[in-house]
Swiss-Prot record:
Stretches that traverse the bilayer: 54-71
The encoding gene: TMEM167A
Taxonomic path: Eukaryota, Metazoa, Chordata, Craniata, Vertebrata
Glycan attachment residues as annotated in the record: N35
Name of the featured protein: Protein kish-A
CC annotations in GO: Golgi apparatus; Golgi membrane
Protein's job: Involved in the early part of the secretory pathway.
Organism from which the protein derives: Homo sapiens
Length: 72
């Protein structure tokens, strides 16, 4: 089933996107800072969310990991 139609899979993909973009921006900031607007601006926005809300994103990742490991 596609991640678009399954809510838990959609949340997992969004969390992975946020974490990946924040990690890439920490390694190479100029890579994401070039595209702050437009379609590629989504990755810059995800990186900003990952940087600013990192405790909340970390808690969401832990909760999602436990739900995938133990509930499914």
């Amino acid at each position: 089933m596609s991640a678009i139609f399954n809510f838990q899979s959609l949340l997992t993909v969004i969390l992975l996107l946020i974490c990946t973009c924040a990690y890439i921006r920490s390694l190479a900031p100029s890579l994401l800072d070039r595209n702050k607007t437009g379609l590629l601006g989504i990755f810059w926005k995800c990186a900003r969310i990952g940087e600013r809300k990192s405790p909340y994103v970390a808690v969401c990742c832990i909760v999602m990991a436990f739900s995938i490991l133990f509930i499914q």
